[in-house]
Regions:
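Beta-strand acidic-aromatic groove motif in beta-rich domains, primarily in extracellular
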Residues: 312-336
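C-terminal motif of bacterial Sec signal peptides marking the signal peptidase cleavage site
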Residues: 13-16
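Beta-strand/beta-sandwich contexts
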Residues: 18-65, 112-155, 188-190, 199-226
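Extra-cytoplasmic beta-strand recognition segments
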Residues: 218, 289-320, 371, 426
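Short carbohydrate-recognition loop motifs
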Residues: 237-284
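Extracellular beta-strand ligand-recognition surfaces/modules
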Residues: 304-305, 319-321, 368-420
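Extracellular beta-strand elements of beta-rich domains used
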Residues: 421-428
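Extracellular carbohydrate recognition and processing domains
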Residues: 335-392
Length: 432
């Protein structure tokens, strides 16, 4: 019986082999490529001489089952024999950036020969997304963030400021795929920054040392009424200058204990600029912010400011509610603390960088915070309790006044802390 069982297994094994006449087998000889197209059959007439990383392609040729490995430049492609025939190979262009660019495909055969075919792996031009501190001073470290920051010995990456000022190479401290660290030079002009690589040049959407759309820098008279704007509400938060200043005076919120539930403490955590004067107008230090900055295209604008939080003043509770409002909601003469949590569900941004990590500080450095006012990335869409807002700012005059209040009304429970939050250069600027 045992012998019969073994014999039956052996027969079954041979039967299973003979039942797979289409099993993949490699061939000998030399492969050749006739052309390459997109893998999508609907695009079969689109012949390619190059493709971006991670693009599905179809290689058409002869004797392609003689290929056992394939490299694009110096990066291997994944070959799936289920998608390989004598005449076609379906594969995806490798996603990794090549170290050595030759603009060739290398086909390694069953006989360990290498056959080449001219084909470019197209690499995206650099993406320049943000600067850690747009107001970084000369001698300080600047950090540009983005992607595809590719630096080659034969084509070094360059950073260009306005007026054709190219950052000297010796000022660049390090380059990774997503970050450029450099020492800010004394004579770098303010404005848009360009990053150039072998694969293209991209201009930033932000400006270095941006002075557009300033609402509060706590030092400079506004251009409409020639008055320095600051506290203009119920509370007089500290506006001060010291050795930690970014540039002149800054606004200080906190520097007192805050409970984990983010309890109401407007005396220490609420900055109010409520437009208006006591005569029913908007003169002097009560000018409407919407008269200082043009908010007509607010859907394509962002609120920005620089913020500094020391390690010994980490922020771990009470999200920052940033609330714009029109004269119909609040002025200095109609001052109230109801408009921003009334039943109409008025929208605002709720900023809580500590929420996921449990605690947040900037290590005593100044960093730029960017909050989109509108559009797909707009964040001024939350109500007082963190739910979706029913009504959002919809016209320029809705940006006449500004309240910044660190307080929790639901969903933002943190940890007991003693936050020290320094803010400067509050501005509203175009996204591009």
């Amino acid at each position: 019986k045992w012998a019969l069982g073994i014999a039956l297994v052996a027969v079954a094994g041979f039967t299973s082999c003979s039942d797979q006449p289409d099993a993949y087998e490699t061939t000998g000889g030399t492969p050749s490529i006739s052309y390459i197209r997109l893998a999508d059959a609907a695009s079969k007439d689109s012949l390619l001489t190059g493709a971006f990383q991670n693009t599905p392609i179809c290689i058409v040729g002869n004797n392609l089952r003689s290929i056992v490995a394939m490299n694009f430049n110096d990066r291997p492609a994944t070959l799936n024999t289920s998608y390989m025939t004598d005449n076609t190979i379906l594969l995806t262009v490798p996603k990794d950036i090549p170290d050595v660019v030759t603009d060739k495909i290398y086909m390694i055969t069953t006989s360990n020969d290498t056959v080449t075919y001219d084909f470019k792996v197209l690499i995206n031009p650099p993406s320049v997304l943000s600067m850690e501190n747009e107001q970084a001073k000369a001698g300080e470290e600047g950090v540009i963030k983005g992607n595809y920051f590719l630096d080659y010995p034969d084509f070094p990456l360059t950073v260009e400021f306005p007026n054709n000022y190219v950052l000297p190479r010796e000022y660049i401290k390090s380059i990774t795929m997503t970050e450029i660290r450099f020492t800010v030079p004394e004579d770098a002009p303010a404005g848009f920054i360009k990053v150039k690589t072998k694969y293209g040049t991209t201009r930033s959407n932000f400006q270095f040392h941006d002075q557009r759309g300033i609402l509060f820098d706590f030092d400079t008279p506004n251009p409409v009424t020639n008055v320095v704007l600051g506290n203009h509400g119920w509370h007089a938060q500290k506006i001060q200058e010291d050795e930690t200043s970014l540039s002149g005076k800054y606004l200080l919120l906190g520097d007192v204990d805050m409970t984990a539930d983010g309890a109401w403490n407007d005396g220490n955590f609420s900055f109010e600029y409520w437009a208006g004067d006591w005569n029913g107008g908007f003169s002097g230090d009560g000018v409407k912010l919407s008269d200082i900055v043009d908010f007509t295209d607010f859907e394509n604008m962002s609120l920005k400011f620089e913020m500094c939080i020391p390690e010994n003043g980490a922020w771990a509770a009470a999200p920052m509610q940033i609330i714009f409002a029109g004269p119909d909601k609040v002025t200095i003469s109609t001052a109230n603390n109801v408009f921003f949590h009334a039943d109409d569900g008025w929208g605002r941004a709720i900023y809580a960088p500590w929420k996921d990590s449990g605690s947040y500080n900037t290590g005593g450095k100044w960093v730029t915070v960017t909050l989109a006012l509108g559009g797909d990335q707009g964040v001024f869409n939350k109500y007082w309790d963190g739910t979706a807002a029913s009504v959002k700012p919809s016209k320029p005059e809705d940006f006449a006044s500004l309240t910044i209040f660190c307080v929790n009304a639901g969903g933002y429970i943190g940890e007991d802390c003693h936050p020290i939050i320094k803010i400067d250069n509050i501005r509203a600027v175009p996204n591009k």
